[in-house]
UniProtKB/Swiss-Prot annotation:
InterPro entries assigned: QCR9, QCR9_sf
GO molecular function, one term: ubiquinol-cytochrome-c reductase activity
Mitochondrial matrix side: 2-21
UniProt-annotated location(s): Mitochondrion inner membrane
Predominant localisation class: mitochondrion
Its membrane topology: Single-pass membrane protein
Record PANTHER family: CYTOCHROME B-C1 COMPLEX SUBUNIT 9, UBIQUINOL-CYTOCHROME C REDUCTASE COMPLEX, SUBUNIT X
GO cellular component terms given for this protein: mitochondrial inner membrane; mitochondrion; respiratory chain complex III
Gene3D superfamilies: Cytochrome b-c1 complex subunit 9 (1.20.5.260)
Protein name, entry field: Cytochrome b-c1 complex subunit 9
Mitochondrial intermembrane side: 48-63
Protein's UniProt keywords contain Membrane: yes
Assembly and interaction partners: Component of the ubiquinol-cytochrome c oxidoreductase (cytochrome b-c1 complex, complex III, CIII), a multisubunit enzyme composed of 11 subunits. The complex is composed of 3 respiratory subunits cytochrome b, cytochrome c1 and Rieske protein UQCRFS1, 2 core protein subunits UQCRC1/QCR1 and UQCRC2/QCR2, and 6 low-molecular weight protein subunits UQCRH/QCR6, UQCRB/QCR7, UQCRQ/QCR8, UQCR10/QCR9, UQCR11/QCR10 and subunit 9, the cleavage product of Rieske protein UQCRFS1.
Length: 63
């Protein structure tokens, strides 16, 4: 019974009106994009460890 109540509250809060539905999608997309970009950057950095400028610049900087 609690799941039905939670579902109905979620529906009435976020998905019932078109404006809140659109806002929910836009906010969700923004969070997904941020998480996807950070994940892709982390994978890229891991695959190219030691080859990127940020990993080797300490060898070439003047002290």
């Amino acid at each position: 019974m609690a799941a039905a109540t939670l579902t109905s509250k979620l529906y009435s809060l976020l998905f019932r009106r078109t404006s809140t539905f659109a806002l929910t999608i836009i906010v969700g997309v923004m969070f997904f994009e941020r998480a996807f970009d950070q994940g892709a950057d982390a994978i890229y950095d891991h695959i190219n460890e030691g080859k990127l400028w940020k990993h080797i610049k300490h060898k070439y900087e003047n002290k």
